[in-house]
């Protein structure tokens, strides 16, 4: 049995750890509320961008912009969104596991794909396993602005525009609720022309200046940038929710451990007192 001093030391250290995890839980809760607000505020902008794409691409059935035109896939691109920090449960690990599983299933050689990474956790994971990273960005703010991730989005888009890759897939953790997030992947490029033209066929009567292709060459890259940014906002909400849950579980576990240690301390203390009383009684009997 551990000594009273050892048990007391463990109780004190666990209480300190509980204070830290409780504070981190509260901080993550605050960050989650802001992330949810950011995502909600960004949605109307994405809706308007969708309308703009629909108005132009949907006005003609023969739009031939490279971002809307599928081509033979000889090299795939993967944009993976992870966290910079740990203490977020399996947030990054689940996304990276899904990425690696898909890469191993689809490709025989590293020349068949390129990886762009957001987040230190993803960079470390992939480098430690020998994967080449074409571009990475770390130290992303907890509430990222569009400008803070624009370089990453532009690089991923340039890989497709310059035909270094023939498709761009994004891997991230989709925020469902505080208690649920889902490792998700979806194709970003080429854009689905069917999706970009659905629901607004009556806009074909519009006239465009200078012409549809010139307009698309401007708004399509902006639209893809917005898709990537919106996905990052979604992933950040998932990260904060996962970390908040992890810190709550850690706090609850610390509380349970403190209770168990306190019970062990009281039992050890009682045994020590009983032994002292027994020794005193035994000593008194010996003197009689």
From Swiss-Prot:
Please give the chief subcellular localization of this protein: membrane
**Alphabetized Pfam families for the sequence:** ATP-synt
Cell membrane is among the record's keywords: yes
Q: Which GO terms describe its cellular component?
A: plasma membrane; proton-transporting ATP synthase complex
- Its membrane topology: Peripheral membrane protein
Q: Do the record's keywords include Membrane?
A: yes
Q: Which residues form a coiled coil?
A: none
Q: Where in the cell is it found?
A: Cell membrane
Q: Which UniProt keywords apply?
A: ATP synthesis, Cell membrane, CF(1), Hydrogen ion transport, Ion transport, Membrane, Transport
Instruction: Output one GO MF annotation.
Output: proton-transporting ATP synthase activity, rotational mechanism
Family membership noted in the UniProt record: Belongs to the ATPase gamma chain family.
Q: Which PANTHER family match?
A: ATP SYNTHASE GAMMA CHAIN (PTHR11693), ATP SYNTHASE SUBUNIT GAMMA, MITOCHONDRIAL (PTHR11693:SF22)
**How is the subunit organization of this protein annotated in UniProt?**
F-type ATPases have 2 components, CF(1) - the catalytic core - and CF(0) - the membrane proton channel. CF(1) has five subunits: alpha(3), beta(3), gamma(1), delta(1), epsilon(1). CF(0) has three main subunits: a, b and c.
What is the recorded name of this protein? ATP synthase gamma chain
The gene designation is atpG
